[in-house]
Amino acid sequence: MAAQVLATAGVQVSVHEHMPSVGRKLLLAGRSGLNMTHTEPIADMVARFGPAADRLEPAIRAFGPAQLRAWSAELGQPTFVGSSGRVFPSSFRAAPLLRAWLAHLRTMGVSFVLRDHWTGWALSPGGAPDSTRCTFQGIHGATVVAADITLLALGGASWPRVGSDGGWVDLLRLAGIDVRPLRPANCAVHVAWRAVFVDRFAGVPVKNIAVTVGSVRQRGDAMVTTRGLEGGPVYAVSSAVRDVVERDGVGQMSIDLQPDLTVDALVRRLAHRRSKESLTTWLRRTIGLSPVAIALLFEATGRRVSNEPTELAALVKHVPVVVIGVAPLDRAISSSGGIAMEGVTESFMLRRFPGTFVAGEMLNWDAPTGGYLLQASFSTAVAAANGALDWLAGH
């Protein structure tokens, strides 16, 4: 995206990609449908970015969902809005959009150098890094590339097999740049299930639940795995529970198995238990819990479940699931951490290296799934590219 903004302004752009092809993580993101952005109000979207919201807001307002959808349509890939407000290309896939995008960039004169890994900056005669000369390691060995500006978009450290391996972190730290530790975000959580529970329910979805950690609550469907839980509502709370696990050794999620019913409504339904009716049948018949939901209730409580309707209703609304860890960084959808916002200007230029800009997951921000990750990546790329143009004009 940054290359397109720069090339449109007449800048000669060379994209150096250390993988054999461009856009692999975009293709991965579109494997089950490319969720590009979201249609919720901008203020609500910005709030999703938590502590980084103030820094990202100007970029998202300048290039937000409307601009992103228009850009996609100009590439022959109109978008549609799903029932949840999420935005997808009409093809639902990333490949057609990526092909059209790369073809357009090439017609604009953008060149691509593949299998070329950025290794930092060349040193000036005085021994300090020279921000106008980048070093690369490629198929033809080490090279030095001089440029008026450099824009780094090296990603975080999730899914390293598609390119974002976090290898830049130590390079920037050695250059004196404050980089906050990269940690898994939007990831599965680990739970110490009993073998009998795993054998029967691994791979089974727990539908229409709400998961809460602290002040973070998200509805949706979760999937039981051999090691814990995954899925949209789990991803939404994963950063919050990760922080607790890192601090205390274990964390806890509260799962509402019937988010559409109040405690009082559950109590009224549970009041009608038939003679000799088993607890499982009672829960299934009166409040519609699925077999996996009932098993999760038993698993989380060690089968210490009250037969008293009021206590049972309260438990159904707040099933305590102990979390012993989260998925590793290389299995997370995204990563949190990155270059501290204090180390970049409003246009995401490195303060220590004037003329070098950064965008996307390299920056220290975090967001849930739902289109926010791609939107922020596109928005910061446009903002950084426009900042680079302003820099060029003044230098």
In which residue ranges do the predicted regions lie?
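A conserved beta-strand/loop element that lines the FAD pocket in flavoprotein oxidoreductases
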Residues: 105-118, 182
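Short beta-strand to alpha-helix junction loop
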Residues: 56-66, 84-103, 113, 159-164, ...
